[in-house]
């Protein structure tokens, strides 16, 4: 290993340790781009992988993936031309009737999304949309509670990738629908906080269509040797702007043709 490779590997480990400690302590840290640079996506995913392996060794169960940066506007803001992804673990799932503690996620914000659950594996190097149609068992409305271990959300692309794509928690709705029962691209979304609209959008805001995002992810995961498997949940990306969370907030999301989902937060 060259001196440069050794230095890069050391930076990856330091960044992973920093984010791991932020998760453990509940105290946000400085941007990890200071260690791995602003443009080294390979290093950023290596950081994510270090902490993914830590989670698996600790007994956490991998249950799917989340897709981020599916908005073209956000991609331009961060200087990238593709989404990113992070891991979903079983202990990140919350139910609609469950009150979510505000400190369960650092600097929480919420996004409305469509979640897809697979009934078949998605592997192979030439996946198509038709493969998605066969593999997706159902879709449900979802609220993702994103968070950042980076102080004040001061992030660039490598920060968010390293930080498991700014993942936190998620809530799935209870109205599963088959793909043939609704149009995910045209589905309109409205999010309300305490009954007041705070975010809105449409499926097409998610990389042109949520299925485009899922296909991108499936291909990337297959190439990486970690394909999406039967039973995996995929959070396909935000349908509208994310909204900051305060104690006592109750968010209701309605997605046309798909149903609704609610996330309630404990008072501070």
From Swiss-Prot:
Record pathway: Xenobiotic degradation; toluene degradation
InterPro entries, alphabetized: Fumarylacetoacetase-like_C, Fumarylacetoacetase_C_sf, Hydratase-Decarb/MhpD_sf
Coiled coil regions in record: none
EC numbers, comma separated: 4.2.-.-
Keyword Lyase: yes
Cellular component aspect of the GO annotation: cytoplasm
Signal sequence, renumbered to the chain: none
Family: Belongs to the hydratase/decarboxylase family.
Function statement: Converts the product of 2-hydroxy-6-oxo-2,4-heptadienoate hydrolase.
Protein name stated in the entry: TodF product hydratase
Species this chain originates from: Pseudomonas putida (strain ATCC 700007 / DSM 6899 / JCM 31910 / BCRC 17059 / LMG 24140 / F1)
């Amino acid at each position: 290993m060259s001196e440069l490779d050794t230095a890069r590997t050391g930076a990856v480990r330091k960044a992973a340790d920093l984010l791991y400690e932020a998760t453990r302590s509940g105290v946000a840290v400085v941007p990890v781009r200071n260690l791995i640079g602003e443009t080294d996506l390979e290093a950023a995913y290596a950081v994510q992988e270090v902490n993914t392996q830590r989670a698996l060794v600790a007994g956490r169960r991998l249950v799917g993936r989340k897709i981020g940066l599916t908005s073209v506007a956000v991609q331009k803001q961060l200087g990238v031309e593709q989404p990113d992804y992070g891991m979903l673990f079983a202990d990140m799932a919350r139910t609609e009737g469950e009150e979510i503690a505000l400190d369960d996620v650092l600097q929480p914000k919420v996004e409305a999304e469509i979640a897809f659950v697979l009934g078949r594996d998605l592997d192979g190097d030439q996946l198509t949309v038709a493969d998605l149609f066969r593999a997706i068992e159902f879709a449900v409305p979802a609220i993702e509670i994103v968070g950042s271990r980076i102080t004040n959300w001061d992030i660039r692309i490598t920060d968010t990738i390293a930080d498991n794509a700014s993942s936190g928690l998620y809530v799935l709705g209870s109205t599963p629908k088959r793909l043939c029962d609704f149009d995910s691209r045209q589905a309109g979304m409205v999010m309300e906080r305490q009954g007041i609209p705070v975010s809105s959008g449409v499926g097409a805001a998610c990389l042109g269509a949520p299925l485009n995002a899922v296909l991108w992810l499936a291909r990337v995961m297959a190439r990486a040797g970690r394909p999406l498997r039967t039973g995996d949940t995929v959070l396909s990306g935000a349908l509208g702007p994310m909204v900051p969370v305060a104690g006592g907030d109750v968010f209701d999301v309605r997605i046309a043709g798909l149903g609704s989902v609610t996330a309630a937060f404990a008072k501070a």
